[in-house]
């Protein structure tokens, strides 16, 4: 990603976080077409509102259009999309686990032999500090009533997590 675009994104997120009193952070940035298409996914520990996405979009656009060293950006000749992660999107940044404590998740991980395994259960803990960040999943039995499975909670090192997706509960 172009250094100038990245700087504009980072500075804008910091500005909007202060202005809205939130803790928004960047989950993913996808810049394609030589900077003509910029897609950002943002998150906050307590969720992201449409107003925050719109404010961030306006702030980034203004910063990029004020950039005289890139004529394409200065002319506003680019597409900018700012959104929050949708339902069923995998966790991309470890900080997202904090937002989903208490929710049901499906986690694909590597066991001690390096084999892929899957567990579905409630995220009960997220320890993101220290040398080995980890999450703890309490397995649940599939069925009409959500019950614990009788299996012990499983603590996984984040380094072993291949994919984690929050499950919707209807």
UniProtKB/Swiss-Prot annotation:
Protein name, entry field: Ribosome maturation factor RimP
Q: Which InterPro entries match?
A: Ribosome_maturation_RimP (IPR003728), RimP_C (IPR028998), RimP_N (IPR028989), RimP_N_sf (IPR035956)
**Keyword Ribosomal protein part of the UniProt annotation:** no
For this entry, list what GO says about its biological process. Answer: ribosomal small subunit assembly; translation
- Cysteine pairs forming cystine bridges in this chain are none
SUPFAM superfamilies membership? YhbC-like, N-terminal domain
Any Gene Ontology CC annotation: cytosol
Name of one Pfam family that matches? RimP_N
Q: What is its main location?
A: cytoplasm
Q: Does the keyword Lipid biosynthesis belong to this entry?
A: no
Q: What does this protein do?
A: Required for maturation of 30S ribosomal subunits.
Which protein family is it in?
Belongs to the RimP family.
Keyword annotations for this protein, in alphabetical order, are: Cytoplasm, Ribosome biogenesis
Where does the protein end up?
A: Cytoplasm
């Amino acid at each position: 990603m172009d250094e100038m675009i990245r700087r504009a994104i980072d500075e804008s997120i910091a500005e909007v976080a202060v202005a809205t009193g939130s803790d928004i952070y960047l989950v993913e940035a996808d810049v394609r077409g030589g900077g003509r298409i910029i897609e950002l996914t943002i998150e906050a520990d307590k969720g992201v509102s449409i107003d925050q996405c719109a404010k961030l979009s306006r702030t980034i656009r203004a910063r990029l259009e004020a950039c005289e060293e890139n004529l394409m950006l200065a002319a506003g000749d680019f597409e900018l999309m700012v959104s929050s992660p949708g339902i069923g999107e995998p966790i991309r940044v470890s900080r997202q686990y904090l937002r989903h404590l208490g929710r049901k998740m499906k986690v694909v991980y590597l066991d001690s032999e390096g084999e892929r395994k899957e567990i579905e259960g409630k995220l009960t803990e997220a320890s993101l500090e220290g040398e080995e960040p980890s999450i703890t999943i309490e397995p649940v039995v599939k069925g009409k009533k959500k019950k614990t499975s009788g299996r012990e909670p499983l603590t996984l090192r984040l380094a072993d997590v291949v994919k984690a997706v929050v499950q919707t509960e209807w």
